Regions:
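Compositionally biased linear targeting/interaction segments
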Residues: 2-9, 15-362
Length: 362
């Protein structure tokens, strides 16, 4: 006679099967998560290693560029011709070469051929004071470089930038802006370290930024040698007070703006033509141009003190391309007439366009 099966035993077997299935599902889910996390860690590690490879290659290229600038300066000393221009310098051309599994490209720019925003103030009586002549230059440059729809901002931006730099907290004129106009931050009231602070001005709003970005948006024709678009930021820099403007590398827009207070913009075209074949070796030749014949002695002395034919400040832009990606290093270098050549700024920036043109744009 068969023993009758207890009803609860079937339920226990069913519950055990469900528990086994749940354990199996949980183990499978945990395994998938472990594999996923391991893959993510491996991918992240590989990306970091690739990034580090590109960065180390860029640093190596930076070291090579520094040595090239030192060699160039020593050659100039031997030749007794301390001149930096865009036609004869070894550093003036773009460079590109393969190295192991990468391609390294680089260009060098003369920062003293750009408009020094810090020149808007002078240090006098233990404080930084506005320089009306420099502000007029800055306004003239902005008027020519800003998008046509925003050219009216030139005067406002020039005065706001001067207020950003000067020591006092007084708004100078209806177009200025001091601490009270800025929330969550205060004006530095001293020279800036980078021209990007220009973006912090009250009137440099999102609309203006978008207009500038649209104006210099990269095109398919853009290359290292031919950017194919106007680069707004290529015309500005932030260097120590008293740094001279190198007339042998300054683009036409900067030269015209610099001479605007003297109504001598015509000198810019003459300088551009002359330096193509015979770079200027001293500033006396510049002041001898007909456009400056009507300058008063004090104006002549002041202008001569602001101009130069060589440079001590350079920018090196380095792109390192590998199968894994592209990195860009921007290094700024000081090469003084006495003392060691040194890096005073180094930053990794997004690669949003072609390399900046070698030397400076015309």
């Amino acid at each position: 006679m068969k023993t009758p099966r207890h009803p609860s035993m079937g339920k226990q077997h069913g519950s055990a099967l469900v528990v086994v299935l749940l354990i199996f599902a949980l183990a499978f889910a945990l395994s998938v998560e472990v594999v996923y996390r391991q893959h993510r860690v491996q991918t992240r590690t590989a990306n970091l290693l690739d990034w580090d490879y590109r960065y180390q290659y860029a640093i190596a290229a930076e070291t090579l560029a520094i040595q090239g600038l030192i060699d160039d300066f020593e050659d100039d000393q031997r030749n007794n011709e301390l001149v930096d221009d865009c036609s004869k310098e070894k550093w003036a051309g773009p460079f590109s070469f393969p190295y192991e599994d990468s391609v390294i490209s680089a260009t060098v720019q003369d920062l003293q051929g750009r408009f020094n925003i810090n020149s808007l103030v002078v240090f006098n009586n233990n404080e930084y004071q506005r320089d009306p002549e420099a502000i007029a230059r800055f306004e003239a440059l902005l008027a020519g470089l800003l998008p046509p729809s925003h050219a009216r901002y030139a005067s406002t931006l020039a005065n706001e930038m001067a207020d950003w730099l000067d020591t006092d907290t007084l708004v100078n004129g209806p177009e200025g802006a001091e601490d009270g106009e800025y929330r969550l931050r205060r004006t530095p009231n001293q020279p800036i370290l980078d021209e990007s602070e220009f973006r912090a001005l009250r009137s440099f709003d999102a609309e203006l930024a978008d207009a500038i970005n649209a104006m210099q948006k990269p095109t398919p024709q853009a290359t290292t040698n031919n950017p194919a678009t106007l680069r707004f930021w290529d015309y500005f820099t932030a260097l120590p007070l008293g740094t001279t403007l190198n007339v042998n590398t300054a683009p036409k827009a900067v030269l015209e703006a610099w001479f605007a207070p003297y109504n001598a913009q015509a000198a810019a075209q003459t300088i551009l033509q002359d330096r193509e074949t015979n770079p200027y070796t001293d500033t006396n030749a510049i002041l001898a141009l007909p456009a400056f014949s009507n300058l008063a002695p004090d104006q002549r002395s002041a202008l001569q003190a602001q101009l130069g034919v060589g440079t001590s400040h350079f920018q090196v832009v380095i792109d390192v391309a590998m199968a894994s990606g592209l990195s860009r290093l921007v290094t700024r270098i000081q090469r003084p007439s006495q003392g060691d050549t040194r890096v005073f700024s180094r930053s990794l920036v997004p690669v949003l366009s072609a390399l900046e043109p070698a030397c400076n744009p015309d």
